[in-house]
Amino acid sequence: MGLEKLTWVSEKKPDWSNVQKLIAACEATNQYTNIGPIISQLESFIRDSFLIEESKAVIVTSNGTSALHALVGGINRQLGRELKFVTQSFTFPSSNQGPLKDSIIVDIDEDGGLDLNAVKNIEYDGIIVTNIHGNVVDINKYVDFCMNHNKLLIFDNAATGYTFYLGKNSCNYGHASIISFHHTKPFGFGEGGCIIVDRLYENNIRIGLNFGLDNSLGEKSQYSNQASNYRMCDLNAAFILSYLQNNYKKIINRHSEIYEIYKNNLPKRFKLFPNHSKKNPVCSSICLLFDKPFRLDKIPFLSRKYYKPLDLSSPVSLDFYQRILCIPCNIDLTDRQIYEIIGVLNEFADKN
């Protein structure tokens, strides 16, 4: 199978038999949404299989963006004020929208994470660091900084669900992290998201998934403008859970193998995106940096560029964006295709 058959997402077919078994619990209770019976099953599976620590709550949401916004809204409600966050320019727009619309955008450093030198002279309450496409920053640099400066630390792990740092899943670090289970992500099916957060904030976040309404208060419950309908429905949960049950180990192993091939056979003039995991990361795409800017239409196979900087005046973010090449990484990718990609990129390097 050649590069003309290359796909960004693996062929994800529903296991209808397994989905039907899962949905039977919904049929028995006639509850398919509003936190029905499959939600807790999915949260338990994520905790156990993604090795999430007991000090963290696992809370599924409708998608990765709603996970980030529900997380921030819940913390705002808990602390009784709207917090000011700093986010990096090299990331997805979610961290500058909704409850984060007033976040401060700063550049990244040469390691691919938020530049801590850029926050020295500004007032803020917390930082959001994005781990890019499965690669992780030097996490302890941010943990130590936020601890020393009494700041909240959130990791946007939308595409980094199973990369380890110093022996534990990177999702366990900071006060919280979020994961995306969007269909384009390695572990996703359809659409979904997940918050992994210190248990201190769990109750306010769960209430925030339901417009801020605390059902235990009955008629006394009041909605919150720091909340919304962020809940995942049980039908989505069933498809995600079924896909994970059947494939998560295969995804972890194959994505590690793919990364290993690129690591040992880097195309000329390309280098891997910065990564601080000792073991191979589980990447959502293989991110390579060329030694000079190039146009994506010069690459003769399916590939992309992420992320267009939120602030185009951020020099390091813009440099990364102009030089990055994001290559498909999924369980359907064959070794033959990988080596063909490497060969094509070597030719590209010779001609450019």
Curated annotation (Swiss-Prot):
| Highest classification ranks of the organism | Viruses, Varidnaviria, Bamfordvirae, Nucleocytoviricota, Megaviricetes
Source species of the chain: Acanthamoeba polyphaga mimivirus
One GO term (biological process): polysaccharide biosynthetic process
Question: What is the protein's given name?
Answer: Uncharacterized protein L136
A molecular function annotated in GO for this UniProt entry is:
pyridoxal phosphate binding
Q: Which domain of life is it from?
A: Viruses
Pfam families documented for this protein: DegT_DnrJ_EryC1
Q: Sorted alphabetically, which InterPro entries does this protein's record hold?
A: DegT/StrS_aminotransferase, PyrdxlP-dep_Trfase, PyrdxlP-dep_Trfase_major
